[in-house]
Amino acid sequence: MSNRLHEELDIRCVKAPASIATATATKSDYVDGSGVDEIAFLWSMATLASGKTMTIKIYAADDATGTNATVVATGTVTAGADAIAKATGCASVKVPGDGKRYYCAEITHDSGSGVICSCVAIARPFYSPAVEPALVVSA
């Protein structure tokens, strides 16, 4: 029997909804990547005006405060001729296991005015097979 999707994923709000000014880089909280193979950051934006862009960068760092953070992935969403109501941008990164273990996502946009944005981080923990019970005998 399989779990329901929400039971298989670790989903965290890493940036509460807030107005983000145009051309202002805003980072989410850092999440610990140990025990997961991939982390996806899902940014939601109230509206992305026609021809405007949302850019998402993912940073890897040595600790949860962002020490020695470096950009490991970048993606852009651009609205076409029509504005995108309820715009969503998703970027993900594979966690190498031998590098930095803390990750965050940064968003910037060029909408011309403040836009309400929020972010969730989604990860699926590594599969760990059940451990066979051990028989302990003591004299």
Task: Give the label of every model feature segment.
Residues 1-139:
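Surface-exposed, low-hydrophobicity beta-strand/loop segments enriched in small/polar/acidic residues
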